[in-house]
Every structure is written in C-alpha cells, then in structure tokens.
UniProtKB/Swiss-Prot annotation:
Gene this protein is translated from: ppiB
EC number(s) on file: 5.2.1.8
The keyword Disulfide bond is assigned to this record: no
Entry's Gene Ontology molecular function annotations: peptidyl-prolyl cis-trans isomerase activity
Family label: Belongs to the cyclophilin-type PPIase family.
Name of protein: Probable peptidyl-prolyl cis-trans isomerase B
Length: 295
C-alpha cells in the first residue's frame, strides 16, 4: 500500500504531465493561430498581387497611351473561340447622321486642323473608297458611310486637310486575341489627336445605353477598319486596322473595311513583329502613311 509520500510523488508526476500536456496544446494553438495568420496574409498578398496584375493587364494599353488619348483593350480570353458573338447586324436609327457634333477635346490638336462640318451629314453614297499609301505598300479602304456617317465625315475631313500624311503608325499588336495596326497619331505616342472628339456609332449604337453586353467581347473580323478611343464618345483621329480576327467589346466604332491589297500589306507588317519584342508596341517594320486620300 503506497505511503503518503508516494501518493504525493505520483500526484506531482500526474500534475507535471498535465501541465506539460497543456503547455504542448497551448504551443500547438499558437502555431495554428500563427499559421492561420500566415495563410490569411498570404491569401491577402495573393489577392493584392492578382488584382495588381489584372489591373495592369486591364490598363496596359491605357498606360501605353498614357495621357489617355486612344487605346484598345482586348478581352482577357486566351484566344478567339467559336463562342464569341459576331458584330451585331446593323439596324439604322431614326437619328443616324442627323446631328453630328465635334466638340473640343481636352488635348490640343497634334497638327493644325479644323473640325469637320457639324450637324446633319449625308449617308449617301453608302460607301466611299480611300487609298492609304504607306512606305510598306498600299492599303485600300472602303468607308461605310451608311452605318457610321459622323465618323466617315470626320475621317474625310482630316484626309482632305492632309492630317494623316507623313505620320507613322505607332502601334502593332500580335496576340491571338488582338491583331491590329494602329495609326492616326502625329505624335506617335498614342496621345495625339485632332483637338476634337465625337460620339461612337456602329456597333455601339446597336445596344441600349449601359447595356452589360457593351462590356462583353464580340468578333471584330479580319479586314475591319475601326476607331481607337480612350472611352465612350472620345473618338478623334486614331484608327486601327484588323489583320486577324480579334476580340473586343463593341465600344470601338467600325467605319469601314480593308481591301485585299491592304490586308497583304498588313500581313507583311505583322510578320515583322514588335520592335521591342512581345506582342504590343511599335512595329519593328516602320510604317509611314505617305498620303491618304479619298478616291
């Protein structure tokens, strides 16, 4: 039969084991709490990094044309897929070409130029042909006056005033989702324009204002001629030529098509790639618009 001293010794050992067990549990709790904090911290960091990366991706083109004159932002899908909707069919509105306005923009004109005639503009003839002579070859254009008359009116005015002559095309994109050559900026940095702006037309005008579909990609097919912009209704002089099917939200006014000779010239330019590598930047093959005229 154990003595009192033995019982006390046993009780001490039992208490010691309990205290050690509690201390061990406490240490595990601290480890778990710290680990949880680290996990949360890592999750927050990952979220922030992801947000920054997505933000940079989303604003990449705006940054490239920083003072935010004219930019295109392709949708962040890996490639053109059959599920992407085509451009909507054109349905003329009752006010098409009735009141074209060209108010001053925030930036001064990159070259001396007068704004086009405002007010009502004709939608006839339905198409107007133009020739863009470049140092890389001719690019024939067919302007769609029946669908985007305010845009064609501006383009024709700038062409007649020689605004585009002896200017360089400052941007080429070669990604799977965006293949365009961008021109129309005498400053050659993505910020130049004519000193005025005007509203979007087709295909933007085929949707109700603030329609969520305006933010969803549609297919801008090879051979499309469209306006670059820095946001809704900020069109100026910069335009882009689509040399392979591209995904963009329908917020870039389509005002014509590119003829076969032009597509051959664009293919040659695109084959040269980007001057600094990558898939977006000044073309390695320098492109100068020597003259642009209506036929």
């Amino acid at each position: 039969m154990p003595t009192n001293e033995q019982r006390r010794a046993t009780a001490k050992r039992k208490l010691k084991r309990q205290l050690e067990r509690r201390a061990k549990q406490a240490r595990w709790r601290r480890v778990l709490l710290i680990s949880g904090g680290v996990v949360v911290a890592v999750a927050v960091i990952i979220t922030v990094v992801a947000t920054v990366v997505i933000s940079k991706l989303g604003h990449k083109h705006d940054t490239a044309s920083s003072t935010a004159s004219n930019s295109l932002t392709a949708t962040k899908t890996p490639a053109v897929t059959p599920s992407v909707l085509p451009l909507p069919s054109f349905q003329p509105s009752t006010n098409l070409g009735v009141n074209c306005q060209y108010p001053p923009s925030a930036d001064k004109a990159a070259k001396p130029v007068k704004p086009p005639r405002a007010g009502k503009v004709p939608t006839d003839p339905a198409t107007v042909s133009a020739s863009m002579a470049t140092n890389q070859g001719n690019i024939g254009l067919l302007l769609n006056n029946a669908e985007s008359p305010c845009t064609v009116n501006s383009f024709a005015s700038l062409t007649g005033q020689g605004f585009f002559n002896n200017t360089k095309c400052h941007r080429l994109t070669t990604s799977l989702m965006l293949g365009v050559l961008q021109c129309g900026d005498p400053k050659v940095d993505g910020t130049g324009g004519p000193g005025y702006k005007f509203a979007n037309e087709y295909p933007t005008d085929q949707y109700p204002p603030n329609d969520p579909k305006l933010k969803q990609p549609v297919l801008y097919p090879r051979g499309t001629l469209a306006m670059a912009n820095s946001g809704p209704n900020t069109n100026g002089s910069q335009f882009f030529l689509v040399y392979h099917d591209s995904q963009l939200p329908p917020e870039y006014t389509v005002f014509g098509t590119i003829q076969a000779d032009g597509l051959a010239t664009l293919d040659k330019i695109a084959k040269g790639g980007i001057a600094s590598g990558g898939d977006d930047g000044p073309p390695a093959t320098e492109v100068t618009i020597e003259s642009l005229r209506l036929d």
